[in-house]
Amino acid sequence: MARRARRPRGRFYSFRRGRWHHLKRLRRRYKFRHRRRQRYRRRAFRKAFHNPRPGTYSVRLPNPQSTMTIRFQGVIFLTEGLILPKNSTAGGYADHMYGARVAKISVNLKEFLLASMNLTYVSKIGGPIAGELIADGSKSQAADNWPNCWLPLDNNVPSATPSAWWRWALMMMQPTDSCRFFNHPKQMTLQDMGRMFGGWHLFRHIETRFQLLATKNEGSFSPVASLLSQGEYLTRRDDVKYSSDHQNRWQKGGQPMTGGIAYATGKMRPDEQQYPAMPPDPPIITATTAQGTQVRCMNSTQAWWSWDTYMSFATLTALGAQWSFPPGQRSVSRRSFNHHKARGAGDPKGQRWHTLVPLGTETITDSYMSAPASELDTNFFTLYVAQGTNKSQQYKFGTATYALKEPVMKSDAWAVVRVQSVWQLGNRQRPYPWDVNWANSTMYWGTQP
């Protein structure tokens, strides 16, 4: 029994381990115990700029007849992209490809299942090394061996974007499916996922936790900003427009804000209506260009830019994102991680349960599993990540960039994310369908009793 002592002004002490310990009590301003917070850290101040859950209300819906809880736990490596040219000067662009240290992690059941699939050479690309079959193969054989993978449009286009976070993840699933490797040795399609959960037709998201740690320095100042958002309402419309077609995500345009000079009222006007991620398209000045052309650039070489856009480091910081400093810029502790927690469906309409497999579906096909019949790929939350630096291009808004290089036998991760997620499957069908007929007839076929 530890000895206790009380001093004036409410100071308590306890004697243990050979000395007196001061019990640091919280102020008794409230009836119950509350931790004192600084005013500028209050939730109301942060929600004035970005509200991750802009309102919800509960709706009384009938609970399913039976439920099953599914848990995911794993790690996600946010790595730098690689390029797979056949030679070092493929098309003249291989040595001039630059990427930004950005990522977008979508919380949906489809991508969590893809992240937990078998780690075999025929089922998962396995990180930033896209694989020689994808880089060199352009016939049907490559598509047969690598289903649901993006084939490069030419040999200087990366075959995977940072949105495909599950390619660089190792995820464990509980309960496990002992027959999954034999039934689905390749990447699972929506049809395969529907057959895997053929006995369940509802699902809901309970909770997902992220713990992000910056792992790579980029100059003397390189924190990683991360912001959790509801659904996809911070994603630009152009991302949704081209989300299903990776090959058309590249467009040829002008040099993106690198100091080009234009005259008169042509293109390249420096107004705020032009997205910095979507540079203008000035005409190329050649020897055959007609005289009197009003647009002149310091460099007449046009550049390629991608439709796949992400939030910059400055944008995330302005919205109140957390910062994680890499080792060397701050001592590693629990506070070195960015902690994010997402609960519920994140749906202002109060839709708690979502459709996994539509009722009355005897033969599960991809047409049934695609929206709106199935909501398997519905995004409940999105985690936006970007690394900043003190030296960056003006049009990148403080985001760290790097030159895409050819693959080596190692991956270069600039952030690591620990993930824990809980989902629940439900079924409103009766668990025992063995019914009896009201009447039976033993007469011959075609006659009536």
Curated annotation (Swiss-Prot):
The keyword DNA-binding applies. One of its GO terms (molecular function) is DNA binding. Residues 6-47 are annotated as: Nuclear localization signals. Pfam families: Gyro_capsid (PF04162). InterPro entries: Capsid_protein (IPR007291). GO terms for biological process: endocytosis involved in viral entry into host cell; viral penetration into host nucleus; virion attachment to host cell. The keyword DNA-binding applies. Induction: VP1 and VP2 are detected 12 hours post infection, while VP3 only after 24 hours. Keywords: Capsid protein, DNA-binding, Host nucleus, Host-virus interaction, Late protein, T=1 icosahedral capsid protein, Viral attachment to host cell, Viral penetration into host cytoplasm, Viral penetration into host nucleus, Virion, Virus endocytosis by host, Virus entry into host cell. One of its GO terms (cellular component) is T=1 icosahedral viral capsid. Residues 1-43 are annotated as: DNA-binding. Belongs to the gyrovirus capsid protein family. Self-assembles to form the virion icosahedral capsid with a T=1 symmetry. This very small capsid (25 nm in diameter) allows the virus to be very stable in the environment and resistant to some disinfectants, including detergents. Essential for the initial attachment to host receptors. After attachment, the virus is endocytosed and traffics to the nucleus. The capsid protein binds and transports the viral genome and Rep across the nuclear envelope. Homomultimer (Potential). Interacts with Rep; this interaction relocates Rep into the nucleus. This is Capsid protein. It comes from Chicken anemia virus (isolate Germany Cuxhaven-1) (CAV). The lineage of its organism: Viruses, Viruses incertae sedis, Anelloviridae, Gyrovirus, Gyrovirus chickenanemia. The gene is VP1.
